Amino acid sequence: MVRTRIQRLLTGINRRMMKLLIALALIAYVASVWGNFVNMSKSIQENGEQKMEKKIEEVIAPLREKIQNLERSFTQKYPPVKFLSEKDRKRILITGGAGFVGSHLTDKLMMDGHEVTVVDNFFTGRKRNVEHWIGHENFELINHDVVEPLYIEVDQIYHLASPASPPNYMYNPIKTLKTNTIGTLNMLGLAKRVGARLLLASTSEVYGDPEVHPQSEEYWGHVNPIGPRACYDEGKRVAETMCYAYMKQEGVEVRVARIFNTFGPRMHMNDGRVVSNFILQALQGEQLTVYGSGEQTRAFQYVSDLVNGLVALMNSNVSSPVNLGNPQEHSIVQFARLIKQLVGSGGEISFLSEAQDDPQRRKPDIRKAKLLLGWEPVVPLEEGLNKTIHYFRKELEHQANNQYIPKPKPARVKKGRTRHN
């Protein structure tokens, strides 16, 4: 009986041990599963964190680059600027200051130590033409259309705002007229209010297809008032008239520069004028297109010469119109051959039908500028062309990554084509 009880006790103990062992095994299994789960969760978490870190890095990288660019811009070195005393330093407004000529004028006046405000609506101007001055304490850039009034305190106004290439002003003749009339009226009103001197950037186009050669300032011109280019030619003529009306009636100090063909870096490659057309065609190995016989003549000045002339005229006592141009005359076909030679490539010269209202000869008489301003062009034609060709090459490289560069074509108008500007 005692044995039976002992056996039952051992059996109970065995069952309890078995249950305990099973429980321990179950606990071990659960612990193992939990460990695997924890490890898996940890792995997933680590992978998730890595992915999250990668995504965060993708977002942060461009922001970091922008911050670095901003830091560089704060410490960037501007072109050397002269120091002028308060008495000598002028507050100067340049309308169209982000354009081809305007941006070079901006460089000149900034480096001379003046405070320069550039106003441009970027119809043809480009911010990158003046971006190297952004942030400088003497420089300000305003996005503004001169057909709207502008209120600003200045000492001098260089009024350059206007489309100047045939495709641009033929594309929007009304805007061209408004800029040259309403815009000029607004700038004259500003000059009257603040007592500033205004220089109008007029053009040799006021002479039209001249019957006098070379053209002096006394020549009244031969202009077609309803031709495809009349919006620009007549717009500048009426702008001159308004300047002298304000000078006579309101006592506004005005200067008028009649600018002849000008070229240089920052020209638009596709602006439709002869220099940009020929250089672009030669660099791309295409035929150089000449309209008419090619015997038409032009006189080309480099942009730095023009800028020096504008500054000299503004600071002079000469209130009557002054021609600013290079009196060295070249035929269009000679010019095409020269560019082809300097580029070292390009196709043959092709001749197309002559454009409407294309002046046969154009050459400035600059005796007045020589006598009264002590100014004349000094940059040789080939030197200026080589600088311009180098700039165009860089532009083509800059835009080469699958960007389309339109081939130079004349603007489409109802009658005729663009002329050899």
Swiss-Prot record:
Keywords: Decarboxylase, Glycoprotein, Golgi apparatus, Lyase, Membrane, NAD, Signal-anchor, Transmembrane, Transmembrane helix. It is found in: Golgi apparatus, Golgi stack membrane. Glycans are attached at N317, N386. GO terms for molecular function: NAD+ binding; UDP-glucuronate decarboxylase activity. The keyword NAD applies. InterPro entries: NAD(P)-bd_dom, NAD(P)-bd_dom_sf, UXS-like, UXS1_N. Residues 41-421 are lumenal. Its cofactor is NAD(+). Its EC number is 4.1.1.35. The active site is at Y232 (proton acceptor). It is an enzyme of class 4 (lyase). Residues 1-19 are cytoplasmic. Coiled coil: none annotated. Residues 400-421 are annotated as: Disordered. It catalyses: UDP-alpha-D-glucuronate + H(+) = UDP-alpha-D-xylose + CO2. One of its GO terms (cellular component) is Golgi cisterna membrane. Pathway: Nucleotide-sugar biosynthesis; UDP-alpha-D-xylose biosynthesis; UDP-alpha-D-xylose from UDP-alpha-D-glucuronate: step 1/1. UDP-alpha-D-glucuronate binds at L150, Y151, K178, N186, G189, K192, R193, Y246, Q249, E250. It is a single-pass type II membrane protein. The chain crosses the membrane at residues 20-40. NAD(+) binds at residues 99-101, 120-121, 123-125, 145-146, 160, 162, 179, 201, 232, 236, 262, 268, 273. Residues 409-421 have a biased composition (Basic residues). Catalyzes the NAD-dependent decarboxylation of UDP-glucuronic acid to UDP-xylose. Necessary for the biosynthesis of the core tetrasaccharide in glycosaminoglycan biosynthesis. Belongs to the NAD(P)-dependent epimerase/dehydratase family. UDP-glucuronic acid decarboxylase subfamily. This is UDP-glucuronic acid decarboxylase 1. It comes from Xenopus tropicalis. The lineage of its organism: Eukaryota, Metazoa, Chordata, Craniata, Vertebrata. The gene is uxs1.
